[in-house]
Amino acid sequence: MCIRDSQLPVLQRLHLWLLSLLYLATFGSFIGFSAGFAMLAKTQFPDVNILRLAFFGPFIGAIARSVGGAISDKFGGVRVTLINFIFMAIFSALLFLTLPGTGSGNFIAFYAVFMGLFLTAGLGSGSTFQMIAVIFRQITIYRVKMKGGSDEQAQREAVTETAAALGFISAIGAVGGFFIPQAFGMSLNMTGSPVGAMKVFLIFYIVCVLLTWLVYGRRKFSQK
């Protein structure tokens, strides 16, 4: 990714970093789960041939991404993203109940819940991407108009800053592809269980619920 000098001011926008966090939680989760699901399933349910089933998750997430964008165009990216994060937190919490503990665990429940995570991560990556485009266009036009700029200038700068934001945030989201498998691996090495990593993910999704609601869920938000 390369940001030109004319696009550098976008790095000073608070919303760039907030939306990067939300996109990391959705798109990052999608590619991270895609990379780590088979490994996690194999360690928790070694008797199951997960290779025959692992591809369904990424497939569901990829289809859901397009659906998430389409739904957001109709109902609003903020609303869809908020509801989606709530479900991601719920599925993350349910995952604890499916893992082997004192018993052998429940693979069918584990698989079903994880498919739910793939679905919501895919939907969320589409809805947050739509949020980024809409919000950056709004705040850029507002900022230029407040400085006395013309409609043409506002539209031109909105295109430039939105494109820069989408490129930068997309790169941040890709970090999840590295972080999630590493988190699972570290938790397994330290405790023999993925529970530690899952607790971090659950807390992260709850934070994203609060962030989406408090910053973007209200009718007006700071235009900085």
Protein language model regions, located:
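Intracellular juxtamembrane helix-capping segments at the cytosolic ends
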Residues: 123-153
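Extracytoplasmic gate region of multi-pass secondary transporters
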Residues: 13-62, 125, 129-130, 180-181
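Transmembrane alpha-helical cores of Major Facilitator Superfamily
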Residues: 24, 55-59, 86, 167-175
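Helix-to-loop junctions at the C-terminal end of transmembrane segments
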Residues: 65-77
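C-terminal transmembrane helical hairpin of 12-TM major facilitator-type secondary transporters
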Residues: 78-128
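A late C-terminal transmembrane helix in Major Facilitator Superfamily
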Residues: 146-190
